[in-house]
Amino acid sequence: SVFISYAVFYLTRKNFSAAMPAMLTQTSLTAEDFAIMSSIFYILYGAMKFVGGMLVDKINPKAMTGPVLIGVGIVNILFGFSDSVAAFYVLYSLNAILQGTSFPPMAKIMASWFSKNERGRWWAIVEAAHNIGGSLAPLLTSFAIAFSGSWKMGFYVPGAISLLMGIVALFTIKDRPGTLGLPNVGQWRNDPTELAQVKASPVNLSFWQIFVKYILTNPLVWIIIIGDMSVYIARTILNDWPQIYYSQVHGWSLIKANSIISWFEAGGLAGGLLAGYLSDFMFKSNRWMTGLIFALALCICIVLVPLVQDTSYTLTAILFTIMGFALYGPHMLFAVGCLDVTHKDAAGSITGFRGLFSYVGAAMAGVPVIMVKNSWAWSGVYIYALIAILLTTLSLALLSRLHRL
C-alpha cells in the first residue's frame, strides 16, 4: 500500500510537466509561467515536507497518507476544469502543499518496520515507486492527451486514480509496530547496528532537544543536505526540461519527447534498487561509498550528452536510461543514509528537514533554468546540470572519507 501510494503521488505530480508541451499550445501558459510555477511548487513542497516530517513523528502515519491522496486527486480534477493562468497557479500551489506531506509518513513507516542492516534494500524498493510513477506519468498523460485531443485529460485520469488509491490507503496502511503490540524491529531482527542506534538515542528528550542535538548541529546532516540539494537540481533539470527541449528544438512529438523521461525513470528504478542492495550487502550499510560509485558513472554520462543529442532517438534514450540509473543511486542513498546518522525517533523530522533543502534545490531548476536558457541558450542549462552533478560527487566523496575515520 505504501509502494502504490507513493507511485500515485508521483503520477499526480509529474503529469504537469508531461502535459506542458500541449498546454503551451492549447492555453495561454508560457515557458516562463512553467518555470515560475515549478519553482513555487518545489519551494512549497519542501516547506510542507519539513512540516509533515515534524507532524508524523507525533501522529499515526496512516492519518496523513489516505486523506492527502484524496485531496491531491480532487485538485488534479479541478485543474482540468480550469482555463485561466491564475487558476493554474493557485491549484498547482495547492497540489504542492498537499504533496509535500506525502513522503514523511512513508519514511517513518520504513524506519519503524525495517532495521538498519536491511533498510537500504527495502527503502530502495519503496523509492522505486516514484520511478514507476514518474515513468508512467509521461506515458499515461501523453496517451490521454493524444486520445482526447485535450490537455485536460492529462489531469482527469491521474486525479481519478489518486482518489481511488486514497480510499484504499485509509484501510491498508498501518502504524508503528509498538502500537500494534509488537517488539521494536531491532529486537525482532536481532540487528546489532539497529540496536546500537536505539541505544544511542535517549528516550526522554523533547522534540526540540532531538532536533537541535541530532539534526541541526550534526555536521554529517549538513554535508548530506548539500549533496542532496545538488542531486535534486540535476534530477529536476533532467526530469522537467528535456521534453520541452526535444519538442521545441528537435521537433519531436509529445509522446516521443515524453518517452525520454520514461526511459530516464526506468533506469532510475533499476539504479535505486541496485544501490540499496549494494549498500546493504557489499558495502555493509556504507551508503556513501556506494553512492560515490554511482555519481562517478553519472559524471561520465553527462559528459556524453552533447555527443548523442543530435544523432538518434535510440542513442538518446539509452543515455537517458543510464543517467537515470546512475542518478537515482545517490538520490536514494542520501534519503536512507540520513536516517543512519541521527536519532532513532527523528525519522520523520530528518526526512522533512532534508526535504526542505532538497526542494530548494529542485526550485533552483525552475526559474534559474529559464534565466540561464535565456542568457546562454540550452548549452548553459547543460553546464548548470553538470556543476550540480560534480557537487554531488564531491559531497559523497567527503561522506565516504568521514565514514572510514
Task: List each model region and its residues.
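Residue-level signature of mid-helix packing/kink "hotspots" within the transmembrane helices
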Residues: 14, 42-50, 134-135, 265-273, ...
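Extracytoplasmic gate region of multi-pass secondary transporters
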Residues: 16-20, 218-273, 331, 365
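Conserved MFS/SLC helix-loop-helix module at the cytosolic interface between two early adjacent transmembrane helices
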Residues: 47-83
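Cytoplasmic membrane-interface "Motif A"-like loop-to-helix N-cap segments
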Residues: 58-69, 281-295
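C-terminal ends and interior cores of transmembrane alpha-helices
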Residues: 70-83, 296-310
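Cytoplasmic helix-loop-helix junction between adjacent transmembrane helices
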Residues: 91-132
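Helix-loop-helix hairpin linking two adjacent transmembrane segments in secondary transporters
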Residues: 126-178
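A late C-terminal transmembrane helix in Major Facilitator Superfamily
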Residues: 344-375
